[in-house]
Amino acid sequence: PSWFAGSWIVSSDDGTYPVRFAPGADGTVVGERAFNAASVGRAVLGDTLLRVDNDPANPNRQLAALINDLLLESTVVARRSESLVEPEADGLAGSEQAEFFADELALQVLHQPGAPPRISRIETLSRYRLQSDGSIDGEQWQATYASPGSGLAAVPLRSAHWQLKLTPGAPPDAHAS
């Protein structure tokens, strides 16, 4: 949604990091994928992450270079999003609650020297709610499933849940690569 446009500081259990969203060619607001992935990656992995690059031939694919010649290839294979604007529960006239939901399924392949690639499926479900002060509260659930070659088990190998707070105005010198 349009209220996502701009630079933000995210506070979560993983730390604090900048993210950016800008209007795309069709006018819809999209995340700056490589920048945002590098920011989150550095918060989670620290110096293990060297860089994140978008694949110029496939907008749904990213490559993350890690130490020890590891390469993490992430490809979004399905996504869906929905925006809602509903009256606030307090019933006050003109009072609205804007929410945005996103669901993304990615296939990740970890390439490691001298070993076969490790494949996993990651599903991330996110809910964001615009606050009256212009900040955004977020909640994310992530489930990691075995590789497709291991069968299509409905039970995740791992799951995680995070609370996020996006505050407007990332410092202009904040950068990631």
Stretch-by-stretch model annotation:
Residues 1-5, 9-177:
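Soluble ligand-binding/transfer domains with enclosed cavities or grooves
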